[in-house]
Amino acid sequence: MSDTEYLARAEAVLAAVERTVDVANDGDHDIDLERNGSVLTLTFENGSKIIVNLQPPMKEVWIAAKAGGFHYRFIDGEWRDTRTGTEFFSALTDYATQQAGLPITFSA
C-alpha cells in the first residue's frame, strides 16, 4: 500500500470514529472527543480515555485503552490487530462499551 493509500484509509477510520461519537452524543452518551492532528482522544464521563492514532511509518492505526495497546494493519480490506486478527471497529466497540458503561457501536 502506498503512503497516499494508507493516509486515505487511515483518515477514513478517524472520520468514522468521529461520526460515531457525534451520533452517540446525540443519545445517552457524553463522550468528549478531541482531535490533534492524527490523534483522537475519547474521554468518557468516568474520566477514562481511549486514544486512536495513526502511525504512518508503520502504516498502522493504534488504539490505547484500559485493556491495553493494540496495533492494526490494513489486511484483506479491513484493519486487523497485528497479533490477534481482531477487526478494528469490533475491538473499539468492545473497549468503548466497557469504558463508557453503555453500549456504543463503531463501524466504518
Swiss-Prot record:
Q: Which family does it belong to?
A: Belongs to the frataxin family.
Q: Which InterPro entries match?
A: CyaY, Frataxin/CyaY, Frataxin/CyaY_sf, Frataxin_CS
Q: Which GO terms describe its molecular function?
A: ferric iron binding; ferrous iron binding
- Which organism is this entry from? Burkholderia cenocepacia (strain ATCC BAA-245 / DSM 16553 / LMG 16656 / NCTC 13227 / J2315 / CF5610) (Burkholderia cepacia (strain J2315))
Q: Which GO terms describe its cellular component?
A: cytosol
Q: Which CDD domains match?
A: Frataxin (cd00503)
Q: Which UniProt keywords apply?
A: Iron, Metal-binding
Name of the protein in its database record: Iron-sulfur cluster assembly protein CyaY
Top-rank lineage group of the source organism: Bacteria
**Role according to the record:** Involved in iron-sulfur (Fe-S) cluster assembly. May act as a regulator of Fe-S biogenesis.
Q: List the disulfide bonds.
A: none
